[in-house]
Amino acid sequence: MITLCKDSNEFLNITDKLKEVKGARLTQKILYNYMISGLYTDKVFTFVSYNKGRMNGCLVLFLTKDQIGELKLVLLFVWVDAHYPKLLEEFINIAIKKAQELRVKKISFITNRNKKVIDRRVNKFGFNKTCSIWEKEMI
């Protein structure tokens, strides 16, 4: 069962899931800070799912504005236990419902995962790659 999470202790369990994500650029501290700020700003929404007392998925949404000032809902962090593949669809549907509730025009996410993996997992929900980010790392 998926529920909205407002328990700061539970946020620590969610940040622990970052350890299971290969090549995650989001740090535990940053993710935790986002979730805590959501308790006060109503711009971050954290959802969690449990089966038999064990976390099997989580979703962190961030409400922001894009470059032209339109509201955008960002999938900041999604983790789903490999034994529950259908849970991703439920989380995407929650994000869609939240976007409709907030009258948001776009849902987006940033990932450094392989394009083929992302296409296979999210194209069926209507997500499309709309741009590429080119960056220079400054050391």
Label each PLM-derived region with a short phrase.
Residues 43-44, 122-128:
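Short glycine-aromatic motifs
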Residues 46, 50-84:
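Conserved donor-binding loop and adjoining core beta-sheet/short helix segment
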